[in-house]
Amino acid sequence: MSNPQDDKPIDQEQEAHVILKVKSQDGDEVLFKNKKSAPLKKLMYVYCDRRGLKLDAFAFIFNGARIGGLETPDELDMEDGDVIDACRAMSGGLRANQRQWSYMLFDHNGL
């Protein structure tokens, strides 16, 4: 017969971790087991290392907000099976209200 005390540490260990899925734009999915109290920065570094890219090459998005890396799964209310989207980071561009000035100041047809 099993002792109820033997089951308790296993449950506490399972509750201390969360299994997260990182999904790329091309559909690749990688599962990570992360402590609920540990910052997500390590998960982000490992994901980028496996892809052979630097951390700043990706933007990690959860529930529509970018993850900076210092947040923990507890702070973001993450549960088992939650998905973090890994999007290739883009730089540059203009806000919509700046585009009109760009066309007024520069001759884009002469390029």
From Swiss-Prot:
Entries under Pfam families matching the protein: Rad60-SLD
Primary subcellular site in the record, as a coarse category: nucleus
GO cellular component entries: cytoplasm; nucleus
Keyword annotations: Cytoplasm, Isopeptide bond, Nucleus, Ubl conjugation pathway
Glycyl lysine isopeptide (Gly-Lys) (interchain with K-? in acceptor proteins) cross-link, chain position(s): G93
Every Ubiquitin-like domain range: 16-93
GO molecular-function terms, A-Z: protein tag activity
Annotated transmembrane regions: none
Cell location: Nucleus; Cytoplasm
InterPro entries named in the record: Rad60/SUMO-like_dom, Ubiquitin-like_dom, Ubiquitin-like_domsf
Top-level taxonomic group: Eukaryota
GO biological process, one term: protein sumoylation
Other noteworthy facts: Stress conditions rapidly and substantially elevates the amount of SUMO1 and SUMO2 conjugates with a concomitant reduction in the amount of free SUMO proteins. The SUMO conjugation system plays an important function in stress protection and/or repair.
Family, as annotated: Belongs to the ubiquitin family. SUMO subfamily.
Function: Ubiquitin-like protein which can be covalently attached to target lysines as a monomer. Does not seem to be involved in protein degradation and may function as an antagonist of ubiquitin in the degradation process. Promotes NPR1 sumoylation to activate defense gene expression and regulate its degradation.
Record note on quaternary structure: Interacts with SAE2, SCE1, SIZ1 and MMS21. Covalently attached to a number of proteins. Interacts with NPR1; this interaction promotes NPR1 phosphorylation and triggers its sumoylation and subsequent degradation.
Protein name according to UniProt: Small ubiquitin-related modifier 3
Organism of derivation: Arabidopsis thaliana
